């Protein structure tokens, strides 16, 4: 059975693992998922990630991050553009998340970028998700 929305699966697995207070979560590998996870790492929402290229398929391991009170750093991971309803934005209309306190992740012609970097580069694209 094929997966309809692998990005939604990534976000849901991270959300569920954080609610269960897991240290790591393992996902099926894809280049887009790695780019999204790299952005989460750069922005300080997760500790890091690693890729395991073993047979029969590669996996992506995400190392989750918690506050000292064991509360997850990520409060909300929300999918914006979905397979049934794609959401695109121009460079001038990229929305702020929580007045600039959160980030949105876009798929652009320059690759997967945060909303802030997309504004700086002057490119628009598909809004994949919001994180705060």
Q: What residue ranges belong to the model's regions?
A:
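Core subunits and conserved enzymes of cellular information-processing
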Residues: 1-132
């Amino acid at each position: 059975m094929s997966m309809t929305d692998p990005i939604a699966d990534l976000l849901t697995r991270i959300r569920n693992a954080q609610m269960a207070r897991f240290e790591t979560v393992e996902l099926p590998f894809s280049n887009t998922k790695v780019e999204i996870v790299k952005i989460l790492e750069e922005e300080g929402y997760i500790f890091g990630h690693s890729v395991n290229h073993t047979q029969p398929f590669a996996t992506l391991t995400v190392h989750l991050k918690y506050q000292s009170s064991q509360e997850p750093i990520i409060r909300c991971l929300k999918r914006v553009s979905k397979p049934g309803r794609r959401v695109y934005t121009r460079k001038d209309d990229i929305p702020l998340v929580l007045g600039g306190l959160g980030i949105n992740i876009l798929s652009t012609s320059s690759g997967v970028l945060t909303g802030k970097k997309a504004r700086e580069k002057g490119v628009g694209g598909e809004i994949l998700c919001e994180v705060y």
